[in-house]
A protein has these predicted regions:
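Alpha-helical transmembrane segments
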Residues: 6-17, 93-106, 168-190, 253-256
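Mid-bilayer segments of alpha-helical transmembrane spans in multi-pass integral membrane proteins
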Residues: 81, 100-115, 136-149, 153
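Transmembrane alpha-helix boundary signature
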Residues: 58, 77-92, 112-121, 155-156, ...
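Interfacial loop-to-transmembrane junctions
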Residues: 270-297
Length: 308
């Protein structure tokens, strides 16, 4: 029972802080562009305004447009409940398995892309197709990096992998480092930041698959996207940067929560700086960049076999 409560608390905290971290990215962008920019809490205001506005949808749209925002939010909330964020143990282990997380993210991405294609908007349709292409290019690299780390740790459970890496009880540390590098790059691609912001390229597609959403649906979708970014970063930290998490509940869990928030703050600052230091990649060059990540993950497999 305590674990279920902890999982719910984790998900609620991530839901509460997700707009703050997305607002932090906007502030970093403004500062690097020598602009005043919005407040770091602007995303909270945007979500509140959208929730109060009426909703309008295309007459030609099917259930996919209506079901995507709550489904996207539910998947992000579920994953936040399962990851070992505040402690070393996963509150709900069935949600904290690497395979479960991959399939859950694929489900939300599929409906996110389907929402754009189904909306009868040309820009949203192109954005949805690009979102699916990004999925095809990113997921193999993610899977290979995860499986390389899972082979070394002997488990696909995120908590077990993090505990073994934190204790240094892995037989192939070089393989773990290479898998961590590949997974880190794949997670950055998953965040949809430059130079990999293809599905929502503002200059080209006008917010991509979200073009036909409005009102509460758009608010929920934007909140879910912010939550997903925090979940992806928490996923990476839980496996490859697991230090600082307590082993038990109680007061130590509060310290673990603070450590997690500090990790997220540092990661989002780094992501914001990188995103604003590069230009958007050409759509046709994405395959070459993602194959480099796959190559690093395959090299990690080689070191797993060698045992280095």
């Amino acid at each position: 029972m305590n674990n279920i409560v902890l999982g719910i608390v984790q998900a609620v905290v991530i839901t509460a802080v997700a707009p703050f971290f997305s607002g932090l990215g906007r502030v970093i962008t403004a500062k690097m562009h020598n602009r005043r920019g919005p407040s770091i809490f602007q995303d909270y205001r945007d979500i509140a305004k959208l929730m109060a506005r009426p909703e309008s949808q295309s007459e030609d749209a099917s259930f996919a447009l209506r079901i995507m925002p709550p489904l996207f939010f539910a998947v992000s909330f579920m994953l936040a409940m399962g990851l070992p964020i505040f402690t070393q143990e996963s509150p709900i282990p069935v949600f904290g398995d690497a395979i479960t997380i991959m399939y859950s993210l694929a489900l939300s991405r599929f409906f996110f892309a389907l929402c754009g294609v189904d909306s009868s908007n040309a820009y949203a349709g192109v954005g949805g197709i690009r979102e699916l292409l990004m999925s095809v290019l990113i997921e193999p690299a993610m899977l290979l990096a995860l499986f390389a780390a899972a082979l070394v740790c002997g488990s696909t459970d995120i908590a077990t992998m993090g505990q073994m890496i934190a204790s240094g009880s892995v037989d192939a540390p070089v393989a773990v480092i290479l898998a961590g590098i590949a997974f880190c790059i794949a997670c950055y691609m998953e965040l949809g930041k430059l130079p990999f912001d293809q599905a929502e390229a503002e200059q080209e597609l006008q917010e991509g698959p979200l073009a036909e959403l409005s009102g509460p649906s758009l608010a929920i979708a934007k909140l879910a996207m912010s939550m997903k970014q925090v979940v992806v970063i928490a996923w990476f930290c839980a496996i490859f940067i697991p230090w600082g998490e307590p082993a038990t509940l109680g007061v130590a869990a509060v310290i673990g929560a603070l450590v997690f928030l500090v990790k997220c703050l540092i990661d989002f600052v780094i992501v914001g700086i990188i995103s604003n230091s590069v230009s958007r990649s050409r759509f046709k060059n994405l395959g070459n960049q993602t194959w480099a990540v796959v190559g690093i993950a395959l090299l990690a497999f080689v070191f797993v076999v060698v045992g280095v």
